């Protein structure tokens, strides 16, 4: 009886130790929150691949999802979250990969606060978008000229300290010589945008257009869907919030007819620490 009791106690102790070890392993799993829309999720995963933490399947490219991860040597657990909500879940995960506009909006400085950033790439330049067929209207050309101005380029450089960079090669004076601005006087151009930095940049263009008695009505949205829907429906003239890979994917998925008019600036995506303060925890 004593032997059986000893064996039982020994088995219980081993089982308890195993359970504790398992719990400890669970606690050691690194969680990284990434955007759940196709193109931004791909950007996040490509950044992690560049850093050496995962390997993606050949050809996954700019439409990669977590299902395209071929090798995950550090056992990272991925949480797919709406891009705008990533700053809100940062405290609940080890890391989050966040678009610069949402990081800035949440009070984060992409240059100072991120642990890693993707390189600037024109593939992800944010663009002015209109419905197909409206690209060459004087109103849109006037808005484009204002956004491609030296005033906007200077504002971006002085305001965002490298977190946002202008992609306009030869900024102008804000006006298009081919437009009859007198004919546009008294008109209103409507544009949908996310608050930061898009609406802020548009505010500079608004001042430029106001010099010609043109009103720029900036309508703010906090999601990535409605700004495209209102341009497709004709409720709004243009939008300014997205990059071309996202636009192409949106058109394909929704049957919309939206086109990019001009690339204005790029925002490198950043990897931010939540529960962790350095990247060392991933490989430890």
Positions of PLM-derived features:
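A bilobed periplasmic-binding-protein/Venus flytrap-type ligand-binding module shared by bacterial periplasmic
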Residues: 124-142, 268-281
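C-terminal motif of bacterial Sec signal peptides marking the signal peptidase cleavage site
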Residues: 18-22
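Short helix-initiation/N-cap motifs at beta->coil->alpha
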Residues: 60-88, 218-229
């Amino acid at each position: 009886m004593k032997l059986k009791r000893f064996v039982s106690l020994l088995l219980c102790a081993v089982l308890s130790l195993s359970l504790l070890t398992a719990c400890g392993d669970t606690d050691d799993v690194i969680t990284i929150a990434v955007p759940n829309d196709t193109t931004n999720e791909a950007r996040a995963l490509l950044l992690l691949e560049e850093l050496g933490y995962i390997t993606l399947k050949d050809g996954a490219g700019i439409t990669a999802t977590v299902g395209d991860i071929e090798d995950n040597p550090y056992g990272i657990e991925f949480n797919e979250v709406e891009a705008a909500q990533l700053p809100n879940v940062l405290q609940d995960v080890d890391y989050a990969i966040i678009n610069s506009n949402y990081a800035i909006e949440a009070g984060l400085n992409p240059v100072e606060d991120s642990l890693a950033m993707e390189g600037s790439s024109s593939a992800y330049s944010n663009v002015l978008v209109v419905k197909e067929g409206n690209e060459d209207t004087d109103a849109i050309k006037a808005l484009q000229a204002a956004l491609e101005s030296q005033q906007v380029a200077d504002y971006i450089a002085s305001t965002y300290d490298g977190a946002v960079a202008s992609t306009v090669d030869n900024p102008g004076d804000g006006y298009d010589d081919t437009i009859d601005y007198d004919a546009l006087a008294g008109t209103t151009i409507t544009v949908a945008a996310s608050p930061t930095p898009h609406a802020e940049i548009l505010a500079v263009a608004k001042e430029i257009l106001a010099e010609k008695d043109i009103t720029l009505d900036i309508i703010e949205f906090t999601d990535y869907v409605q700004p495209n829907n209102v341009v497709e429906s004709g409720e709004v003239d243009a939008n300014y919030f997205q990059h071309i890979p996202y636009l192409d994917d949106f058109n394909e998925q929704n049957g919309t007819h939206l086109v990019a008019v001009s690339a204005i600036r790029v925002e490198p995506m950043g990897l931010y620490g939540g529960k962790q303060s350095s990247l060392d925890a991933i490989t430890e």
